[in-house]
């Protein structure tokens, strides 16, 4: 008989293998030929169908046939891999969820200045869209929708960008170490 070896988390091909498995499962259970957009990575996916497209809820079959946990969200602004998909006047753009960014900043796992410098580079690269007011305005609306927040978060998002775009400003957010 066949000898099946499970994929180990951390293997070089884990992400690609999970992505392929996700796509196969989605292809088997959803009418993707009707979709206007499909993106997937690892075990996450985002699929957009034209308004009014009818299909059977795929979650029960994805759970039993593919052993996948399935959730269908119907927010005004879609999300993929922790990023909102925002439409500005000129394009679509994936922008990190600022609540998750702040949560990461609150972790106490920063080892030293070198580690902080690496975090700074990553934060700066992935959050560069916060320098665009059109994006910030849409992101504020998205945060309100996703977290049922009634207020406006534009000022908070601008403050977040101020601290992310400058290493010196980022350092002021962190407590000073003794010794």
UniProtKB/Swiss-Prot annotation:
EC annotation from Swiss-Prot or TrEMBL: 2.1.1.-, 2.7.7.48, 3.6.4.13
An example Gene Ontology molecular-function term: ATP binding
InterPro entries: DNA/RNA_pol_sf, RNA-dep_RNA_pol_alsuvir
Catalysed conversion reaction: RNA(n) + a ribonucleoside 5'-triphosphate = RNA(n+1) + diphosphate; ATP + H2O = ADP + phosphate + H(+)
Keywords noted in UniProt: ATP-binding, Helicase, Hydrolase, Nucleotide-binding, Nucleotidyltransferase, RNA suppression of termination, RNA-directed RNA polymerase, Transferase, Viral RNA replication
BP term (GO), one: DNA-templated transcription
Protein family according to the UniProt entry: Belongs to the ssRNA positive-strand viruses RNA-directed RNA polymerase family.
Entry function: Replicase large subunit: is an RNA-dependent RNA polymerase active in viral RNA replication.
The name this protein goes by in its record: Replicase large subunit
């Amino acid at each position: 008989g066949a000898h099946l070896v499970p994929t180990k988390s951390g293997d070089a091909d884990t992400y690609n293998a999970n992505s392929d498995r996700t796509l196969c499962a989605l292809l088997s259970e959803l009418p993707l030929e009707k979709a206007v957009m499909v993106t997937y990575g690892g075990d996450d996916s985002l699929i957009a169908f034209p308004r009014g497209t009818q299909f059977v809820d795929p979650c029960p079959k994805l759970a039993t046939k593919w052993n996948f946990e399935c959730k269908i969200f119907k927010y005004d602004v879609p999300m993929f891999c922790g990023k909102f998909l925002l439409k500005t006047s000129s394009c679509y753009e994936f922008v990190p969820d600022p609540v998750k960014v702040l949560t990461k900043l609150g972790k106490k796992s920063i080892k030293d200045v070198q580690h902080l410098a690496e975090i700074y580079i990553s934060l700066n690269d992935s959050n560069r869209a916060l320098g665009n007011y059109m994006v910030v305005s849409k992101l504020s609306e998205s945060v309100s929708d996703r977290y049922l927040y009634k207020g406006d978060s534009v000022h908070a998002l601008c403050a977040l960008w101020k601290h992310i775009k400058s290493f010196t400003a980022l350092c002021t957010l962190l407590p000073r170490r003794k010794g």
